[in-house]
């Protein structure tokens, strides 16, 4: 329940405070999406701290680089990646490590079953706290929320970017809140109490902004799948019957080909959206035929965005969904097509470089001002525009946009 979520966030905030976390600190998190990671996201924000989100598939050396970049004193990781994280944290600023397990949020019977089938064979160092011991350490602490600062960096999300080297994208509280409000203002498809299936990881902006924060703001019930087996996606959809899902195009191609869903009534689906990767016209048509044949009212939703704008900037959903288009801009978001490497806006129908300006625009790249200045440029209108280099976009008369 939402009441329990608030309780868990406060307990996590107390535990973080007990470990000395304070405003301005950056906590590195190496994990898939779990309830504990969600609690940590909001608990850190309550204290004015920031999460540095790292893909658990990285090597020990890769994890070390991201730890060193932000100088984290606290590392939170999934138990299955602890050996790599232990190696990564050596000779870094890390002082304490908190280890979580997929069993931490399971009911007792399931947790026991999980531990029997997936025993934890790690040998933990003396600076490690398991999640339950970590939470227990917070007893007696009652942290007060820091005053709301819209420009507070709540997460650093890493991306290879379009200009070469990996970069840490700083997304603010305002970015996440604005995106949630943009969806709320634009879409009539989301209603309090509906279910959303979250199959996206926390270390991409799409996973947190669209998969966690936006649905919570709208009062949705989120079903978290920490480590999706694509072969079981159809079974999950049929079991939980979620009205909403955010995924990548291959997820929906998998659903369309799943024999389990043959002849099933899927009319409970309201808005299944594809992002995070390219969607071919043929794949879109295949998925749309599947949805229509199974009683779904609307075709596959899709959009366009970048990590640098907290994931989505345009959306094609519901009845406003043209085949092959990435849709229209979200509320308060300006999407324009410019002559490459210039500030010259192109007429409707001409191809050029896509530029995005709006409330979800990143604060910048962490400790990389030169790279930030390359992609965030102040145009004559006085706004910062996020340039997407190497893309090919075209705007149409009804504000629809295609991107290749």
Locate the predicted segments by residue.
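Conserved adenylate-forming
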Residues: 16-22, 139-151, 156-198
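Gly/Ser/Thr-rich phosphate-binding loop
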Residues: 243-247, 256-323, 334
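Conserved ATP-dependent adenylate/AMP-binding module captured primarily in the ANL superfamily
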Residues: 58-92, 179-197, 229-243
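Short hydrophobic alpha-helices that are characteristic scaffold elements of the AMP-binding
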Residues: 42-47, 69, 204, 213-217
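Structural core segment of the AMP-binding/adenylate-forming
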Residues: 18-19, 46-133
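Conserved AMP-binding/adenylate-forming
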Residues: 2-4, 8, 12-58, 70
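Conserved AMP-binding/adenylation subdomain of ANL enzymes
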Residues: 177-195, 203-246, 254, 258-259
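Conserved ATP-binding/catalytic segment of the ANL
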Residues: 19, 30, 344-349, 355-404
């Amino acid at each position: 329940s939402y009441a329990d979520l608030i309780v868990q966030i406060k307990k996590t905030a107390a535990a973080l405070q007990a470990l000395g976390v304070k405003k301005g600190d950056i906590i590195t998190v190496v994990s898939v999406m779990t309830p504990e990671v969600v609690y940590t996201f909001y608990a850190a924000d309550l204290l004015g701290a920031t999460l540095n989100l790292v893909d658990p598939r990285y090597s020990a050396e890769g994890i070390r680089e991201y730890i060193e970049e932000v100088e984290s004193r606290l590392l939170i990781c999934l138990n299955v990646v602890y050996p790599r994280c232990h190696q990564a944290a050596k000779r870094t600023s890390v002082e304490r490590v908190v280890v979580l397990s997929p069993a931490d949020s399971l009911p007792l019977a399931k947790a026991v079953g999980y531990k029997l089938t997936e025993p934890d064979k790690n040998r933990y160092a003396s600076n490690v706290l398991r999640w339950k011991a970590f939470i227990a350490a917070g007893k007696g602490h009652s942290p007060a929320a820091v005053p709301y600062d819209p420009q507070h960096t709540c997460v650093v999300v890493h991306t290879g970017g379009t200009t070469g080297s990996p970069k840490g994208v700083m997304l603010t509280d305002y970015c996440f809140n604005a995106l949630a409000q943009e969806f709320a203002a634009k879409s009539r498809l989301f209603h309090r109490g509906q279910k959303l299936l979250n199959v996206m990881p926390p270390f991409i902006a799409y996973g947190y902004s669209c998969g966690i924060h936006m649905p919570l703001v709208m009062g949705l019930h989120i079903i978290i799948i920490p480590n999706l087996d694509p072969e079981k996606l159809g079974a999950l959809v049929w079991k939980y019957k979620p009205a909403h899902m955010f995924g990548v195009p291959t997820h929906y191609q998998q659903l369309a080909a799943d024999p389990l869903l043959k002849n099933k009534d899927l009319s409970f689906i309201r808005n299944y959206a594809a992002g995070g990767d390219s969607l071919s016209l043929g794949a879109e048509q295949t998925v749309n035929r599947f949805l229509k044949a199974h009683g779904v009212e609307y075709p596959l939703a899709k959009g366009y965005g970048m990590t640098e704008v907290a994931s989505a900037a345009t959306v094609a959903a519901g009845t406003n969904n043209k085949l092959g288009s990435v849709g229209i801009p979200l509320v308060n978001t300006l999407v324009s097509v410019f002559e490459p490497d210039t500030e010259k806006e192109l007429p409707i129908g001409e191809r050029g470089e896509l530029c995005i300006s709006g409330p979800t625009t990143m604060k910048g790249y962490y400790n990389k001002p030169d790279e930030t200045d390359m992609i965030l440029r102040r145009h004559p209108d006085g706004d910062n525009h996020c340039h997407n280099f190497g893309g090919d976009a075209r705007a149409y008369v009804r504000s629809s946009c295609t991107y290749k």
